[in-house]
Amino acid sequence: MPLYEHVLLARQDVTSQQVETMIDTYKGVIEQNGGRLEKIEMWGVKSLAYRIKKNRKAHFALLNIDAPPAAIAEMERQMQISEDVLRFMTIRVEELDSEPSAMMQKRDRDDRKDRERGRRRDDEGFGGGGGFGGDRGDRGDRGDRGERSFGGEG
């Protein structure tokens, strides 16, 4: 049977549990039509490059599928009907990767770096340096700056 990689984007206002339930539904569709899901990766909520159906973020999931084309067509038909699915893309591949995808490897690498530094991801704040400042540093006392005009008058 042909092998496919399928990426699914679900609305951000559905819970992770609801996304898993949706994937279980699509897994059932694949299995009813003679296929099987080899691997499921939940990439979590990520920002989108641009708004899709008024959403700035979405739940991302990767499905590795071994199924006949009719099963993929039925799954995609049901995804088009669902209001919770923003986008999806199915690509036929020669072989499925058994190792974690690049997104999962990146997440593991980032988590490992943060643990080595002794902080978590969400502690960073603006600028990524742990505070509000960027790369400018303190400019010190700038002294008396005198009167400034703001245009319009005189």
UniProtKB/Swiss-Prot annotation:
Keyword Ribosomal protein carried by entry: yes
Gene3D superfamilies recorded: 3.30.70.60
Region (Disordered): 97-154
InterPro entries cross-referenced by the UniProt entry: Ribosomal_bS6, Ribosomal_bS6_sf, Ribosomal_S6_plastid/chlpt, Transl_elong_EF1B/ribsomal_bS6
Superkingdom per UniProt: Bacteria
Any one of the GO CC terms: cytosolic small ribosomal subunit
Signal peptide location: none
Amino acid composition bias (Basic and acidic residues), ranges on this chain: 105-124, 135-154
UniProt GO molecular function: small ribosomal subunit rRNA binding; structural constituent of ribosome
Example GO biological process: translation
Keywords: Ribonucleoprotein, Ribosomal protein, RNA-binding, rRNA-binding
Physiological role: Binds together with bS18 to 16S ribosomal RNA.
UniProt record similarity statement: Belongs to the bacterial ribosomal protein bS6 family.
Protein name: Small ribosomal subunit protein bS6
Natural source organism: Methylobacterium radiotolerans (strain ATCC 27329 / DSM 1819 / JCM 2831 / NBRC 15690 / NCIMB 10815 / 0-1)
